[in-house]
Amino acid sequence: SRVTGKLATALADLGFDDVFDTNWAADLTIIEEGTEFLSRVKAALTGGKSVLPIITSCSPGWIKFIEHNFPDQLDHLSTCKSPHTMMGAVVKSYYAQKIGIDPKKMFVVSVMPCTAKKFEIERPEMMNNGLPNVDAVITTRELAQMIKTAGIDFANLPEGEFDQPLGLSTGAADIFGVTGGVMEAALRTVYELVTGRELPFDKLHVEPIVGLDGVKDATIKIENTLPAYDFLEGVEVKVAV
């Protein structure tokens, strides 16, 4: 069963002052990746310097794999940070200013499903103004142990809510953890930004790139663009997962 609300309550009971939803930052990631994609495509179509295709992954383990084994492909990687490191950067800038706290006094903790996220926050790129975006990462298993050790009766906790405004998110963020989800979310964002219309798939679900079997691909033709994006009129966007 869905226990998101109980997790928010448990984290508050453990002593965290504010509890945010990484899905908010997943939406931010999609906006950043979508606009980066558009800028690269525009450069390629207008004779500028551009590297395509653009490759995206929020997995620090996968990024490290590319760095070690395929360094010649690094220019193809999206420059966007992963959602939880974006969240840390926003918390220590926008949110710190909003609530009037020195970011040096903040300690940001991410709850993540993968131990590679612990390594990720140590990377020099994950710092701003001499401060780490995220100070610590705990895995979901470690969080479960913390809740148990604290004697919290998780099953009977009331449904809590994330603190605002960094607790809101869309369906695009929800599918981030699904195979092909990041690509589908990016397509939704880019298509609507360029045309002013929703992606022409049933329930915005891009069936050709869904599933675990092999490499999946899809082609989406962009037509009737908004004036600002007329350079994309008739362009076919090809994606693969």
What residue ranges belong to the model's regions?
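Iron-sulfur-associated redox domains of electron-transfer enzymes in respiratory
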Residues: 1-241
